[in-house]
Amino acid sequence: MLIRRIKCLRYLGTRYNSSHYVTTPIFYVNAAPHIGHLYSAVIADAHCRYQRLRYPEQDVRLCTGTDEHGTKIQQAASLHGVPVAKYCDDISQRYREVFRSASIQQDDFIRTTEDRHKRAVANFWRTLHTRGHIYSAAYSGWYCVSDETFLTDSQLRLDEATGTRYSLESGHPVEWTEETNYMFRLSQFQDDVRHWVKTEARVRPAKFEKILLDTLSEPLPDVSVSRPSNRVHWAIPVPDDDSQTVYVWLDALVNYLSSVGYPDEKFSAHWPPAQQVIGKDILKFHGIYWTAFLLAAGLEPPGQLYVHSHWTVDGQKMSKSKHNVVDPLQAAQQYTMEGLRYFLLREGVAHSDGNYSHVKAQRILNSELADTLGNLLSRASAKSLNPGQIYPSPSAEHLADLLRSLDVAKRLQDSLLQLSERCESHYECNHFHLVADTTMAALHAANNFFESSKPWTLKAGAPDGNQARLETIIAMTMDALRLSGIVLQPIIPQLANRLLDKLSVPTAQRGWNYLAESFATSPNSSNSPAGLGESRQLDGQTSALLFQRILEETSAKEVKEQKPQPAKRSKSKKKERRETMS
């Protein structure tokens, strides 16, 4: 098998390759971005942020961008009454604005209308053609204009009343088309593609691997990889044949190569991608076509396809006709963009569709970010309790006594001791909701400890005043906040950094390795804030009000500063999806 020869090369390449290259799908500019597009981007961004945090020696690279060719783009531009190029510029810029607002830390934003990409597509085409994998043939079949693909009879349903056929997958109508196209010998790569899908957890979650294998259980027909230029002119011309343009999906998939410098030799420093994040609607194109194209070109397929499901809105599919498409920038006005990031990664799971609702978002963000996290910081740094505004060092004597005498102190210690290992395991699988679960459990333990130890009874002037014990309680609480802030950096980077700024944690001490240093790991040390040295001043320039509670029917601009509410667990029933499929 061809793939076995490529696997031999992989050991030589990855053995010396410190690159961790991650991609989002490039987003089709036939419409403005919605939360489903943002979800793809925040998954990839959180994954890359974790990789940088956990493996600082690794060269992590994230690529995103926009897909700008094809019939649907021509139609959308015409509908808006603007030239196609200007339409593409405008929509592509909106994606940039959304990603910038959401703190997506991409290293490259590729557009398929760029010259570097056109050059890569031409080279890739010539490689496939020279190797004998592309041939010209008369082709006829059912063509879906909306999906820009030919479909077989088994992929269609017939409306008996009208005689119209529709795609089973998308529901869009198809039309019979006869034309001369270039064809790709997909049938020759069926065994190789199946072998790739079945080995080494290539496709995750596992349900999507099964979907691909079910598709591969039937013979694969060769596929059309060009269109007549008189029908699809907004596209890249086929090299040496101006009568044809490159099929939009072949064009679009090559972006992953264009972004790292293909066809120049430098691209091999980043190839293959460690992980490609995609939505379930484009699984076939990536899992079968893309894999086959790469094998045909003599290139290694990606390390893993990470496939996520879609978002409904109040239980209904998002659609323009229902007027329920959620604009990320508008949603951010209500929840802040950090809040929206948290909600998407907290509530979304890859193997099943997530449901977006204002009620749910408000409940989760108020309960977890405003109360459980934000309120604990406000209480520990309150001037009435902490007039010196310090992150103190604990007393070894009082630390030992608290751990011995208070069950809640021991539970907090146990929770923090497990935080690093558990969250690392969840991050490695992109199980961001479980990272949030684990971190919130630690913060609940910290809130319970703080409440049970009653630090307000120990402050100066109180009958039981004991400054050393008070500072030890504050130090233990701030250790829990600091560790939580480090863990949450990939999910809510701006909010986590504000938390760590308030605690005066130096940038150099925000790495994953600092999760190993706290009162929990060094209970006999008198120098605890996690090995950070002596007591330090809190940052007076950073507000202790970390996340404002969201009020019903108000925008973020209208929310006035409010007194933090006591932290409490949400009474909502946990979703059965918490046991995540691997």
Swiss-Prot record:
Region Disordered, residue ranges: 555-582
EC number of this enzyme: 6.1.1.10
Keywords: Aminoacyl-tRNA synthetase, ATP-binding, Ligase, Mitochondrion, Nucleotide-binding, Protein biosynthesis, Transit peptide
Disulfide bonds: none
A cellular-component GO term for this protein: mitochondrion
Presequence boundaries: 1-95
Motif ('KMSKS' region): 317-321
Subcellular location as annotated: Mitochondrion matrix
GO molecular-function terms, A-Z: ATP binding; methionine-tRNA ligase activity
Entry keyword Aminoacyl-tRNA synthetase: yes
Protein's GO biological process: methionyl-tRNA aminoacylation
Residues that hold ATP according to the record: 320
Motif 'HIGH' region, residue range(s) on this chain: 27-37
UniProt record similarity statement: Belongs to the class-I aminoacyl-tRNA synthetase family.
Matches recorded under PANTHER family: METHIONINE--TRNA LIGASE, MITOCHONDRIAL, METHIONYL-TRNA SYNTHETASE
Protein name, UniProt field: Methionine--tRNA ligase, mitochondrial
Organism: Drosophila melanogaster
Gene: MetRS-m
